[in-house]
Amino acid sequence: MNVFAHPTNVDINNRIVVLDLYEMGEQLRPTALVVALEAIQNRVMENRKRGKYTWVFLDEVYLYFKYKYSGEILYRAWKRFRKYGAALTAASQNVEECLKSETARLMFANSEFLLLFNQAATDRAELSKLLHISDTQLSYITNAEAGHGLLRMGGSIVPFVNTIPRDTELYKLMTTTPGENLV
């Protein structure tokens, strides 16, 4: 099968590389996730040899845990990257879906740093059990406004507020609100 063995329009030597699998069909997605992780691992290894720090950002990480093999590869990378001069940041709006995977649960529980924003009731219940979050702390991620949440660093969990005024250039650059095309 040589579906992925063709020239690409992505310059993998750029400082920032985006691998967008949004339109990948369901049949090819498990393989595409593994291929993407392999490409990311190769880049981390190359940068390590050159003494460069790498920051890997995975959005919608729950997709990796829908498939056993990509979830396992991601878990190994999660454990290894820090040793190789890389940080791995994962984001998902679908926490409950992630936590169906035992591998994802291990990653959440063993992560030194977590930012939690507004969560649905079922997500809060799962996170509370897994991370030992009190009811008082959970109130900070219940119907929370944008920029409000909980920060877990090591064994400490603290509420935070990090709002950006709407009339600033930073807000225009950072907003993720659908329909706000401010830039």
What name fits each language-model region?
Residues 1-86, 99-102, 140-144, 149-155:
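P-loop NTPase motor domains
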Residues 92:
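H-loop/switch region of ABC-family ATPase nucleotide-binding domains
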